[in-house]
């Protein structure tokens, strides 16, 4: 029956009116249909609305409903029958009043809109989504953050590097990898890197308490954590490996170069991410989601919300599922992720979005309500999600034209499943997305559907569902429905559904299939977008001492509306039944909000800690004797004013503000308006009072609102560190504002009071007594730091001085070893120092620094031997943490030490405090102003300034217990000229690196003075303050130079091209520079004396210049007394031990063990010796494969061995061409079961090409008994050697190619030695262990081996990433020069500068000219040294490349060469060719 005739309207109107009059009447009796026969509900089918006249713009009507019989009409409840009547009535009314709506009764032929519904699925992985975009738009911006920007190509390179770094550090496919980052572009690099390595991302928010982080680590079983450099130290003791990711730890040049296996294949069914949310059992629950599920979510959301090419605001915390949307949906649709700093995110969001052209944002309604829509001129799409939308929010944003407004819904277990544009009522969410099948079921019986229009629990099916709850199969089973009976009725192939716990219904307002949110089935709530299980809060709160029972509610109305309220019962109940108990308040001084918040802050994230606390006599129970949550929630919601017996807040005890404190009063009133809303009673608690902002109950969203008001009202933005400080009060914030608006007014109270408090107990001291001039026992803090290790060196260099160093560690022995290792790395440690170095295991943050009673008494001069002098150098340098956080490391230990000095009976000789964080000035009159700036500066600057004030006051008080109290104030500190070791993370080096990379510097400040000194000089000043009477109370280290001198130095001496720019233009370029810094230590070349003779070595592949410490070490050895090894006397024992230590360090250089390395005079010698030792493995029936690209020193060893045994060599040749590369495809046909040895080089010394050694090893080791021997001579100067990652059997290289003398090193896998190697040394040495003894022919060149350890330490200090970066630039410049002249030069090998494919060994010939003649002309001019001929590799030169006797020209760089030298060489080469072409 189809109703279309307009003449039926009058009758239908009467029916509608009758129906509505009954619907709106009194409550029905037991049988709702008995008295109302006029309402004829069809017994077989439910109605379906369709358009009367369909136009192109009309949307298809409400999805057709099920046959009523399938719902079990006979089992309909009274409520369901009410719903059916109401639905019919509304449909009739819609038909009656609308020209476009009709309805029909349909049969079973097409019963449901679900028929055959197949959810959209993506069968790709997250990295693939990103890589597809990277291939399509490599140069488009992918990430634009406050700290830099990255294109898709750069993000691809960097994340690839991170992935390979993680593989080297032990990450394996499917392994959970916790991830903790502040907002940064490196956050995106890291998360993609984890996924590309096959890891599963498990985010830990930096703000979460350590206990929660520990729970997540325990749940995931993680052994590796990826973190920002700021967070790395937090996790140091929680897992085996912490991998910091930042601009100075990641470089695209660190791509796969054969050091390790390729990236593992990742499949859609593999886990991608685990999201931890609040759990009702008291610990977070982890939702594991597969790659295919996440990618399906991202694509569905991107299509629904117009993500194509969007510049997306990344606002969500990394622990939210929205975080993945912000990043991967944006990258999948070729957009750009825009990342604000934490301060901009909280307090300057509008400005950031405008400056970064943000066009799309997904935020919570609570946040959107704070923002002013007109402040977002670039915004085109705004999506509300995370919590219920309110009408005032929609009205606010709908008033602005040009912004498309959407609402999204979906728990973390399903991802986005419902979405749509805003409806008239915010409860209407939208339509099911194409990745989801959404069904409403009976909450008490999920196997039963609810009728159309009835409220039901939403269950979601499709490919986007979670895989499981980690380690909790029971919870997974309870949450997921498998093969529900109604799935067949719906005729959908989806068989797995998730129970959301959310109550929804089809909207009867719109009648078009949209879903409407109603409520929850449990006590889970959403609070400012965060999903909270109230049971988890209750679990922890119940453990607060004195709490017998508790209920936590989110108040829906009343005085506490929208607040988390904890209702607790203190003490035992009365003992009787509490069913029907009336709730009544009581006071308990032992349970306060302060106690509660402090207790929970170490257990829960900040957003889960209740704002309010109510203590009651007894909590009620229901008739099942369970806590009656409903009654408690209603009781709280019914409160219309502050209960008289409520727990008093700390702020109510605050002082009243005075009438003249206008700024403070304004702050307090705005605070009251934000927190108390319309409640007059609550406002009175805050207005005109001074109180602690955090303890007043303000939450994270409200603090943003307060900050915006302060900025707008006072024209001054209070720094985030100040407003979020745990000690921030109304008065302290007012003081900051007043100080900014009226210079000269008092500084913030909190820091001034801190400076005064520690000294109040310091009374008068006895008169001073003279002490010995040179204090012989010095206590030193911060000994293991960059400056501290140099102070320690100079102290130990004084033969009568004993040093007592405070060092953190798991034990005293570990602390000692840590400090000694630092000294070894610095290159100055001597074992003789052990008797005068006393390492005290302690911690600056602990009372009395964590020292034992005896040690503390030595500081107090009450135990023998007593400490004579204290150098307080220890502090935590962290520019983003607030003062309160840094106080415990930077202020409290100063107080502790001064208390110890104050308690002395005999005065201390010297107390020296090393300050920092302040601007220096030649004019002492500026010092007070600079100190005042520091007190308003960063948390670090403030903490150092407060400590300095404390020391000054201590020094000025009468009867001081220290003869000398002195302060040393250095500027920037660099490494000394002798060792060239720098703190490369320091600001000054980052500034220089940035300018070098840009090619520009700030010309406006070129005449400004740069206060900079080397560590030797600063340490000397400190020691002078300790030991000399004539030292000043305050010594400013004013050494330095003008910035223009620095820029000139970098240009003239180191070859960097730098040009001045205005400050504004320079800053603009700096902000848009690439994130990967090519940081290099500018004093590095000083380590190589041969570089200062005016000749530039571009013949490095034939032998590098020698590192100074290597030469000096050999000289020291040869001028020392020649004690024999292995004797019983102390001198021999010490020399033997040093030899063993050296072996261990040189083995570690290759990632080998000491018994796996041997030394010889050259690689040729060692490989010949190895060949002799391998003879027992071989016979004439065996086969040897040798690469034709080998250096003859390598190839000749195997040719000779094959000749001796009558074996025919198989030559492994590359495909023909000028770019010869060893291929696995050409190796496979050569391998047979008879293969016993394969030899090749890691890098061709002729063309510089890198060969895939790990893949070669995998192929060779498939043959039982076969060994792989690799010549690494051309690899070793350019890349780290990791024989375990390469999985080779033998590996050899020459140290004279690695900045050392003529000595070579060979690795032999222990198992290969035992299986294949016979000893060739003297018969009486046959039982000696290790490779060196097996191959030793006479004594080693110990004097040359002595030179090697300093080289390994030097390379470690410089860092391989920096070496690769520098060499990549060098080869890029020269290859570009050659490529631009294809008619002049014929290039051999890889023509790109890709560091994954080549090292900077570059060969070419000049077309039409003899290579020998060209090279001779260059060398004769005396400035450059290059090589020509066959480079001791005739087979690749003549047989492969087809060159004649003249061969080729080889130019080879290493990291000490400069760009300027390469450019000069290009000019020189042009000049040489001009003379040759002219016939001169």
Curated annotation (Swiss-Prot):
Residues 1100-1465 are annotated as: Aminotransferase domain. Residues 662-741 form the Carrier domain. Coiled coil: none annotated. Its EC number is 6.3.2.-. InterPro entries: AA_adenyl_dom, ACP-like_sf, Aminotrans_V_dom, AMP-bd_C_sf, AMP-binding_CS, AMP-dep_synth/lig_dom, ANL_N_sf, Far_NAD-bd. Residues 31-59, 739-773 are annotated as: Disordered. Keywords: Ligase, Phosphopantetheine, Phosphoprotein. PANTHER family: CARRIER DOMAIN-CONTAINING PROTEIN, NONRIBOSOMAL PEPTIDE SYNTHASE INPA. This is Nonribosomal peptide synthetase-like enzyme fsqF. The lineage of its organism: Eukaryota, Fungi, Dikarya, Ascomycota, Pezizomycotina. The gene is fsqF.
């Amino acid at each position: 029956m189809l109703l279309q005739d307009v003449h039926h309207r009058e009758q239908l109107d009467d029916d509608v009116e009758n129906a509505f009059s009954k619907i709106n009447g009194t409550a029905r009796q037991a049988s709702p249909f008995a008295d109302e026969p006029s309402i004829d509900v069809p017994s077989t089918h439910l109605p379906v609305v369709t358009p009367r006249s369909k136009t192109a713009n009309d949307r298809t009507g409400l999805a057709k409903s099920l046959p009523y019989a399938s719902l079990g009409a006979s089992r309909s409840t009274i409520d369901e029958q009410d719903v059916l009547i109401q639905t019919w009535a509304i449909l009739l009314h819609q038909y009656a009043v609308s020209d476009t709506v009709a309805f029909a009764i349909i049969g079973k032929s097409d019963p449901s809109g679900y028929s055959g519904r197949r959810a959209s699925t993506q069968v790709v992985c997250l990295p693939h989504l990103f890589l597809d975009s990277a291939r399509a738009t490599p140069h488009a911006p992918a990430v634009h953050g406050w700290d830099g920007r990255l294109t898709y190509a750069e993000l691809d390179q960097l994340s690839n590097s991170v992935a390979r770094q993680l593989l080297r550090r032990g990450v394996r496919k499917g392994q959970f990898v916790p991830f903790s980052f502040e907002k940064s572009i490196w956050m995106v690099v890291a998360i993609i890197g984890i996924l590309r390595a096959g890891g599963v991302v498990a985010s830990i928010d930096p703000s979460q308490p350590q206990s929660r982080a520990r729970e997540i680590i325990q749940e995931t079983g993680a052994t590796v954590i990826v973190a920002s450099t700021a967070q790395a130290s937090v996790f140091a003791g929680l897992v085996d490996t912490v991998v910091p990711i930042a601009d100075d730890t990641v470089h695209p040049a660190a791509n796969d170069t054969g050091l390790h296996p390729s990236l593992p294949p990742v499949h859609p069914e593999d886990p991608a991410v685990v999201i931890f949310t609040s759990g009702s059992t008291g610990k977070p629950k982890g939702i594991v989601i597969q790659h295919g599920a996440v990618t399906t979510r991202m694509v569905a959301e991107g299509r629904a919300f117009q993500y194509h090419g969007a510049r997306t605001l990344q606002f969500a915390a990394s622990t939210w599922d929205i975080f993945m949307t912000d990043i991967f949906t944006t990258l999948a649709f070729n957009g750009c992720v825009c990342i604000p700093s934490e301060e901009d995110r909280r307090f300057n969001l509008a400005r950031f979005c405008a400056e970064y052209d943000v066009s799309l944002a997904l935020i919570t309604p609570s946040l959107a309500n704070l923002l002013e829509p007109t402040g977002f001129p670039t915004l085109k799409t705004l999506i509300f999600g995370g919590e219920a939308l309110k009408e005032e929010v929609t009205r606010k944003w709908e008033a602005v034209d040009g912004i498309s407004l959407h609402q999204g819904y979906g728990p973390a277990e399903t991802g986005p499943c419902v979405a749509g544009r805003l409806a008239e009522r915010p409860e209407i969410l939208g339509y099911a997305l194409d990745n989801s099948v959404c069904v409403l079921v009976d909450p008490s019986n999920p196997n039963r559907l609810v009728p159309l229009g009835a409220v039901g629990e939403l269950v979601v099916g499709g490919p986007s569902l979670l895989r499981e709850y980690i380690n909790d199969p029971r919870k997974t089973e309870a949450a997921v429905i498998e093969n529900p009976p109604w799935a067949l009725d719906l005729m959908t192939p989806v068989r797995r559904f998730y129970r959301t716990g959310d109550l929804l219904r089809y909207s009867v307002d719109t009648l078009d299939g949209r879903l409407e949110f109603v409520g929850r089935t449990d006590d889970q709530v959403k609070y400012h977008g965060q999903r909270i299980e109230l049971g988890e809060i209750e679990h922890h709160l119940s453990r607060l001492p004195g709490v017998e029972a508790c209920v936590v509610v989110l108040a829906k109305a009343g005085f506490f509306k929208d607040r988390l309220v904890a209702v607790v019962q203190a003490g035992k109940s009365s003992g009787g039944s509490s069913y029907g108990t009336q709730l009544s308040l009581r006071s308990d001084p032992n349970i306060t909000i302060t106690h509660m918040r402090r207790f929970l802050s170490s257990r829960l994230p900040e957003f889960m800690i209740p704002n309010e606390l109510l203590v009651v006599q007894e909590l009620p129970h229901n008739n099942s004797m369970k806590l009656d949550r409903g009654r408690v929630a209603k009781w709280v919601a019914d409160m219309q004013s502050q209960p008289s017996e409520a727990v008093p807040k700390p702020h109510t005890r605050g002082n009243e503000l005075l009438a003249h404190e206008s700024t403070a009063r304004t702050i307090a009133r705005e605070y009251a308006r934000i927190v108390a809303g319309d409640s007059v009673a609550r406002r009175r608690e805050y207005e005109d009072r001074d109180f602690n902002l955090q303890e007043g109950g303000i939450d994270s969203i409200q603090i943003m609102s307060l900050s915006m008001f302060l900025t707008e009202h006072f024209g001054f933005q209070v720094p985030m560190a100040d407003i979020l400080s745990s000690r921030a009060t109304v008065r302290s914030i007012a003081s900051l504002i007043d100080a900014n608006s009226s210079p000269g007014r008092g500084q913030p109270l909190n820091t001034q009071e801190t400076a005064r408090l520690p000294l109040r107990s310091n009374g008068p001291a006895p008169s001073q007594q003279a002490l010995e001039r040179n204090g012989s026992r010095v206590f030193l803090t911060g000994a293991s730091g960059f400056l501290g290790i140099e102070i320690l060196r100079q102290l130990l260099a004084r033969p009568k001085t004993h040093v007592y160093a405070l060092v953190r560690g798991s034990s005293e022995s570990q602390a000692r070893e840590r400090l000694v290792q630092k000294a070894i790395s610095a290159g100055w440690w001597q074992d003789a120092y052990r008797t005068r170095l006393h390492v005290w295991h302690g911690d600056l943050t602990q009372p009395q620094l964590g020292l034992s009673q005896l040690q503390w008494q030595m500081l107090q001069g009450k135990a023998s031997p007593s400490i004579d002098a204290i150098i307080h150098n220890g502090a935590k340098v962290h520019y983003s943490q607030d003062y309160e956080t840094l106080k415990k490391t930077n202020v409290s230990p100063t107080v502790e030490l001064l208390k110890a000095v104050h308690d002395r009976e005999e005065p201390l000789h010297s107390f020296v405090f090393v300050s920092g964080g302040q601007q220096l000035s030649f004019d002492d009159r500026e010092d007070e102003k600079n100190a005042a700036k520091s007190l308003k500066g960063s948390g670090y600057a403030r903490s150092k300034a407060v400590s300095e004030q404390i020391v000054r006051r201590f020094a000025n008080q009468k009867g001081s217990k220290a003869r000398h109290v002195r302060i040393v104030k250095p500027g920037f500190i660099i490494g000394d000229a002798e060792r060239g070791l720098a703190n490369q993370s320091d600001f000054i080096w980052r500034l220089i690196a940035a300018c070098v990379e840009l090619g520009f510097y700030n010309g406006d400040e070129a005449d400004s003075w740069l206060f900079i000194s080397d560590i030797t000089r600063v340490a000397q000043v400190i020691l002078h303050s300790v030991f000399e009477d004539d030292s000043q109370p305050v010594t400013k280290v004013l050494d330095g130079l003008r910035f223009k001198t620095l820029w000139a130095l970098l240009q003239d001496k180191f070859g960097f091209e730098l040009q001045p720019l205005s400050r504004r233009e320079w800053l603009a370029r700096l902000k848009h520079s690439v994130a990967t810094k090519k940081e290099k230590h500018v004093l590095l070349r000083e380590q190589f004396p041969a570089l200062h003779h005016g000749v530039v070595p571009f013949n490095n592949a034939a032998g590098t210049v020698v590192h100074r410490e290597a030469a000096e070490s050999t000289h020291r050895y040869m001028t020392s007394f020649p004690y024999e090894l292995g004797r019983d006397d102390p001198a021999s024992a010490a020399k033997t031990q040093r030899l063993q230590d050296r072996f261990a360090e040189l083995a570690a250089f290759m990632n080998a063990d000491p018994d796996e390395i041997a030394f010889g005079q050259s690689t040729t010698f060692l490989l010949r010796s190895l060949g002799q030792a391998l003879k027992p493995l071989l016979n004439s029936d065996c086969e040897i494969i040798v690469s034709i690209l080998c250096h003859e020193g390598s190839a000749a060893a195997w040719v000779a061995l094959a000749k001796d045994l009558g074996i025919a060599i198989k030559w492994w040749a590359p495909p023909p061409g000028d770019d010869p590369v060893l291929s696995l495809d050409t190796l496979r046909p050569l391998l047979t079961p008879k293969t016993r040895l394969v030899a090749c080089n890691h890098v061709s010394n002729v063309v510089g090409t890198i060969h895939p050694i790990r893949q070669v090893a995998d192929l060779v080791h498939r043959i039982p008994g076969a060994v792989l021997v690799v010549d690494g001579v051309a690899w070793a100067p350019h890349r780290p050697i990791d024989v375990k990652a390469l999985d080779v059997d033998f590996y050899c290289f020459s140290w004279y190619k690695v900045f050392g003398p003529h000595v070579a090193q060979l690795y032999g896998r222990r198992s290969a030695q035992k299986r294949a190697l016979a000893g060739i040394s003297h018969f009486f040495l046959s039982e000696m262990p290790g490779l060196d003894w097996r191959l030793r022919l006479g004594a080693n060149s110990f004097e040359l081996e002595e030179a090697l350890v300093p080289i390994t330490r030097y390379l470690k200090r410089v860092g391989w990433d920096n070496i690769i970066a520098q060499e990549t630039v060098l080869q890029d410049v020269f290859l570009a020069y050659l490529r631009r002249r294809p008619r002049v030069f014929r290039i051999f090998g890889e023509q790109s500068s890709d560091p994954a494919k080549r090292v900077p060994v570059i060969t070419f010939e000049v077309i039409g000219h003899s290579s020998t003649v060209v090279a001779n002309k260059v060398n004769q001019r005396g400035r450059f040294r290059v090589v020509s001929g066959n480079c001791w590799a005739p087979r690749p030169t003549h047989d492969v490349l087809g060159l004649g006797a003249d061969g080729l020209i080889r130019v080879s760089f290493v990291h000490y060469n400069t760009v300027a030298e390469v450019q000069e060489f290009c000019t020189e080469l042009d000049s040489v060719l001009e003379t040759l072409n002219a016939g001169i």
